[in-house]
From Swiss-Prot:
Top EC category: ligase
Keyword ATP-binding carried by entry: yes
EC number(s) recorded for this UniProt protein: 6.3.5.2
UniProt GO MF annotations: ATP binding; GMP synthase activity
Complex and partners: Homodimer.
Catalytic activity: XMP + L-glutamine + ATP + H2O = GMP + L-glutamate + AMP + diphosphate + 2 H(+)
Pathway assigned to this chain's UniProt record: Purine metabolism; GMP biosynthesis; GMP from XMP (L-Gln route): step 1/1
Name of the molecule in the record: GMP synthase [glutamine-hydrolyzing]
GO cellular component, one term: cytosol
Function per UniProt: Catalyzes the synthesis of GMP from XMP.
Domain GMPS ATP-PPase: from-to ranges: 203-392
Binding-site list for ATP: S230, G231, G232, V233, D234, S235, S236
Glutamine amidotransferase type-1 domain segment(s): 11-202
Amino acid sequence: MANINLDAFDKIIALDFGSQYNQLITRRLRDFGIYSELLSHKLTADEIKEINPKGIIFSGGPNSVYDPNAFKVDPEIFKLGIPILGICYGMQLMSYDLGGKVEKADNSEYGRADIEVLDDEAVLLKGLPKKQYVWMSHGDLVTQAPAGFEVTATSKNCPIASIADNDRKFYGVQFHPEVRNSEYGLDILRRFAFDVCGAKANWTMDDFIDMQIDEIRKEVGDKKVILGLSGGVDSSVTAVLIHKAIGDQLTCIFVDHGLLRKNEADQVMDALSRDLGVNIIKVDAADRFLGKLEGVTDPEQKRKIIGKEFIEVFNEEAKKIKDADFLAQGTLYTDVIESGTDTAQTIKSHHNVGGLPKKLGFKLIEPLRKLFKDETRELGEKLGIPHELVWRQPFPGPGLGIRVIGEITPEKLEIVRESDAILREEIKKAGLDEEIWQYFTVLPGIRSVGVMGDGRTYDYAVAIRAVTSIDGMTADFAKIPWDILQKISVRIVNEVDHVNRILYDVTSKPPSTIEYE
């Protein structure tokens, strides 16, 4: 599977107990230059010893430690001599297992809270302000710290907000230092990682590239690899990385289903094939896809048709490539976490490659499976992929097919494609393109009366969707300046045929999703 050998890097592992913030723990540590993975809480002490981490973090979670079905940890872990930091549920679990008391709180704490540092010399809190705000999310609390622990911070509703056992290097915080809403949370994590664990910041993207290229060469040998290229960031970076490792032994199949953004297919071919030398077979299948989608209005049915047709087209082309033993995919670490931990729900398969390895008998190569999205973008730039391609907007697998509400027709696709291009152009001109997390146009499927010149019109409305977010889990609508919105509106109505009204979506996520379908 072209998995990188991580023995060369200092590691801090996080055990997953189900917190919505658990991915942030590993993200923060990697930002410090320390390699980190989120692993199952079911790992045994022997398995952890084999990993040889510099430190262990117990994540937060939704359970109560005194519940018989609560997530537990191998008690032998506490005997390994490895520093441990418990966060929220993790602090409660460590306290409970080591003889402390955990009870239901009289007043739960969710959101911002103020804590007071009780010990100015506490390892994780030394030199930080005595009063600071943090992010709490708990309904239980530690009411008695275990023997050997000192209480180092308190809050109004949580008398034991932080604990420390310096002899065993066990620490706990009831709040979430991994969340940016905790004022000095990153400082606390840094102190645990560097001062307590003694980890070195030796996780670099250059090392990752060299080691991953070596791993790919060893695994593939003289065999051939095929890759389903969507034109998105993940598959593009995967393609260039594998190409650097094995050259023309890689063949990418780029299925243009006619649902891409304006000029997107040409941009991908120019950047990857012409400029970087990646071997790409481009299949123009727009008529085929649109024929299958004719008359279909249900969004889930549209997704299934697009996914099924993609697999069939890919399958037809893949069979033409002789001696191909491997299929490459742009799986990221977030996908691995979401589908592979005991506490997570299974995610949907990617529409264009789900089932292909089994269907065609390929071995799987996933060279990005250890990377987060931002690391993938960094890797892409180091590999020489153009900045605008690496930092392009998130785009759904079914493409514009789910930005046309109702039946998809060539006319409707053209309206969305052209209006979206105008929106992206004006947002970039205004310098907002890296400030707004995602922005696009949608054809909601409604028509309205309008007046153009001296005549009455009955044409389509176009909706603009623009959101700010960190990770896409939650989002707020972007406050685009009115003059910019006006310019976008005027251009779309004047330059795109059959449009006489522009709508601006001012809904957050939740209750809405970012995409309409």
